């Protein structure tokens, strides 16, 4: 027997290997079936000479995603095996009566599981490397990166699982805690956003990135890890631009995030030791063994049940044929209160191992009920000021706007002071019209034919503030009325003013080309003169020089207000008897120097924008005439 002050117990280590070798063997076998054997088959069946990049891609894919899944699944299995004695009273008393410190027990059991998992990885990746080398397709960098990713995943998930084992004395509770905590933050954030989206006017959290996803490790790593092709800037073209060509190599992104989680895993392992040192042997068999964690478990179950089951019950019973404007906040809170109390008392029963929990849990139930009701009251009265908040114009660096209607639409980024002021005015008009907009939504989703609705609106605004904050609001299924166009501050008047501000009008037509500082350059285009609805009266291609001339003319027309006013109620671009359709082609200039550094290859390097030239746009019509493009004399106006 080792000394009581020893950090590592060899006898216990060997005993663990003897007891749990089937789990170890199964883990090794699965890794062999995942990595070296499929790689061997792929390289053996390859037509021609195997490419190193193909083997590298497979190694990185398995190292990242296979390591993530295997580490997450088998991490809890090995933790349950190595610390299974903590869930049986006799085994717990037996281990703790040994002349071995708890630190030694913890370290030995922890390292046994870690050695089993890491040794399997080393064996599998070593065989994969030998296989690739035999076919001349070995990339040591990719092999090492893939192995490192798998080891880091094991380190975090196994440590996390061990920590979960320290908090429970029930063997089956450990995987439940472990699985729940891996997705709890992102799940609760989704449920809270769903609740807010139903009852907060203008809430746009659905489109915002998850704020607390990093607290859900499995979800975050699935989103972050990615194996992508490395793009390289290979050569400079004659016009001074760079040609981006995909390279044959692959890279694993997200490895830094995985390294952070692995470092957190080491911290979790130390925390597990601290919890184990203070864990009472008598707590074996309890659902939660740590006293301070029992209230967290109890109220956590209540909150999760309220937001998940409560909203689900309300939706199934009342909400299948409803829409956001028709949801009842009191009804939803009542369902959440019912399911939350069920969850609360269920947790009490698990903690006390008895059905008689009313006396011990009634105070906590009242506290939970009061908090939930206060939450509902705060939502209904908008005590946080969320619905009515708009930033000051001086605080806004730029604003992204999306506005769709029965007529024209707008989707662009605005940074001019006038544009920001008009956006804020339209936003405030939507806030002031809240009661009427919601009343239309509650009346019926299908508006009757005789209802005074001229246009449906969908309005989304995202403010980027100078202090780095982002404010998002979204208003869907709204209405605008043409009879209110001349009423200052009305939805129709402010939205129309926003559509027709020079910056918005120019951006609506020219898109990326509207910005003088854009790195896009024109390569040509196409024109088509449409008269009385007939296409093909006069059409043809445009040179790059002609396209640049037309863009300058379009910019002058829009800045001078020559274009027809945009409307919420009709499509102004195609409503006339004469117009010219322009399709302008552009490419995006790559500013990077010739290098092999990774470049974002997901964004398009070329594209096109369409512009409609109406009879009022005299500058553009003059430019077309100067190019010899015939237009109806009555429309040219010169």
Over which residues does each language-model region extend?
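Central hydrophobic cores of alpha-helical transmembrane segments
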Residues: 172-185, 360-372
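Function-determining sites in protein domains
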Residues: 359-368, 375-638
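Internal/C-terminal transmembrane anchor helices
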Residues: 297-308, 344-386
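Aromatic- and glycine-rich beta-strand/loop motifs that create alpha-glucan
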Residues: 1-28
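Long, hydrophobic alpha-helical segments
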Residues: 63-91
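Terminal transmembrane helical anchor/hairpin motif
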Residues: 41-59, 186-275, 280-289, 307-335, ...
């Amino acid at each position: 027997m080792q000394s009581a002050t020893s950090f590592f117990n060899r006898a216990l280590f060997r005993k663990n290997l003897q007891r749990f070798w089937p789990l170890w063997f199964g883990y090794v076998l699965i890794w062999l079936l995942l990595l070296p054997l499929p790689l061997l088959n792929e390289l053996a069946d390859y037509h021609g000479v195997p490419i190193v990049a193909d083997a590298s891609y497979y190694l990185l894919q398995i190292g990242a995603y296979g390591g993530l899944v295997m580490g997450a699944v088998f991490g809890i299995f090995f933790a349950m095996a190595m610390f299974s004695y903590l869930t049986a009273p006799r085994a717990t008393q037996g281990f703790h009566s040994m002349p071995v410190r708890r630190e030694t027990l913890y370290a030995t059991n922890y390292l046994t599981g870690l050695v089993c998992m890491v040794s399997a990885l080393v064996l599998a990746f070593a065989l994969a490397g030998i296989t690739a080398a035999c076919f001349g397709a070995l990339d040591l960098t990719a092999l090492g990166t893939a192995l490192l990713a798998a080891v880091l995943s094991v380190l975090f998930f196994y440590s996390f699982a061990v920590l979960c084992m320290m908090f429970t004395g029930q063997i089956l509770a450990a995987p439940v805690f472990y699985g729940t905590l891996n997705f709890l933050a992102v799940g609760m954030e989704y449920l809270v956003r769903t609740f807010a989206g139903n009852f907060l006017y203008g809430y746009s959290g659905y489109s915002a990135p998850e704020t607390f996803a990093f607290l859900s490790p499995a979800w975050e790593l699935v989103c972050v890890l990615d194996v992508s092709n490395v793009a390289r800037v290979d050569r400079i073209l004659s016009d001074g631009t760079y040609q981006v060509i995909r390279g044959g190599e692959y890279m694993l992104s997200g490895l830094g995030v995985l390294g952070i989680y692995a470092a957190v895993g080491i911290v979790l392992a130390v925390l597990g030791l601290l919890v184990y040192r203070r864990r009472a042997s008598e707590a074996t068999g309890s659902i939660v063994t740590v006293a301070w964690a029992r209230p967290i478990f109890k109220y956590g179950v209540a909150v999760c049940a309220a937001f998940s089951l409560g909203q689900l019950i309300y939706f199934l019973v009342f909400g299948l044929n409803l829409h956001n404007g028709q949801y009842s906040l009191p009804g939803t809170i009542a369902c959440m209160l019912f399911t939350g109390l069920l969850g609360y008392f269920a947790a009490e029963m698990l903690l006390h191992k008895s059905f008689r929990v009313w006396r011990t849990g009634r105070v906590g139930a009242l506290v939970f009920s009061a908090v939930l009701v206060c939450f509902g009251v705060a939502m209904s009265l908008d005590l946080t000021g969320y619905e009515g908040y708009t930033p000051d114009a001086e605080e806004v660096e730029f604003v992204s706007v999306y506005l769709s209607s029965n007529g024209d639409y707008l989707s662009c980024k605005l940074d001019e002071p006038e544009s920001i002021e008009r956006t804020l005015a339209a936003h405030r008009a939507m806030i002031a019209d809240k009661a009427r907009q919601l009343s239309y939504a509650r009346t019926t989703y299908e508006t009757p034919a005789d209802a005074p609705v001229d246009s449906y609106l969908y309005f989304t605004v995202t403010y980027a503030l100078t202090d780095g904050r982002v404010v998002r609001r979204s208003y869907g299924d709204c209405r605008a009325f043409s009879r209110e166009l001349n009423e200052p501050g009305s939805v129709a008047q402010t939205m129309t003013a926003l559509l027709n501000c020079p910056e918005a009008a120019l951006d609506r037509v020219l898109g990326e080309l509207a910005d003088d500082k854009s790195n896009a350059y024109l390569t040509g285009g196409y024109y088509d003169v449409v008269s009385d609805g007939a296409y093909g009266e006069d059409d043809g291609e445009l040179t790059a020089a002609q396209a640049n001339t037309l863009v300058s003319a379009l910019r002058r027309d829009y800045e001078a207000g020559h274009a027809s006013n945009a409307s919420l109620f009709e499509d102004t671009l195609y409503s006339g008897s004469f117009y010219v359709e322009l399709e302008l082609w552009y490419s995006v200039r790559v500013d990077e120097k010739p290098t092999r550094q990774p470049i974002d290859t997901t964004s398009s390097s070329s594209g096109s924008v369409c512009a409609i030239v109406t009879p009022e746009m005299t500058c553009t019509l003059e430019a077309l005439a100067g190019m010899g493009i015939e237009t109806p004399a009555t429309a040219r106006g010169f």
